[in-house]
Amino acid sequence: MTPAPHAGVEAALLALPTGVFRGQTGNRRYVVSKTLFNAGKSIKLVAEELGGDDYISLNFYRLNRGARLYPCEMSAKKVTDFVMTLKPEPAQDDA
């Protein structure tokens, strides 16, 4: 059985924290916002590079007929590579 084309991306997205967090991929750091809609069947992820101009935006839909990845004005490879390599940073207390 062949895995679903977006199975790795789906698992990586689900593993990321919901809400706003900081993360790193390669030598770049990002502020990331992950929002769930429709009881988690739709995921919106937006990331802005800290101190740079890189930007990531995508929508991911978990449909009955299969998962669908919709990058926003960028390649599917760019958003897939980003999601698969993004490592959230530990949360810092504001105390």
Question: Would you name each region that the model predicts?
Answer:
Residues 92-95:
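Polar/charged low-complexity regulatory segments
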Residues 36-80:
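Acidic, aromatic-enriched beta-alpha/helix-loop junctions
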Residues 17, 75-76, 87:
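Residues that cap or delimit alpha-helices
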Residues 1-33:
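Negatively charged, low-complexity tracts enriched in Asp/Glu with abundant Ser/Thr
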Residues 83-90:
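Long, highly charged low-complexity segments enriched in Glu/Asp and Lys/Arg with interspersed Ser/Thr
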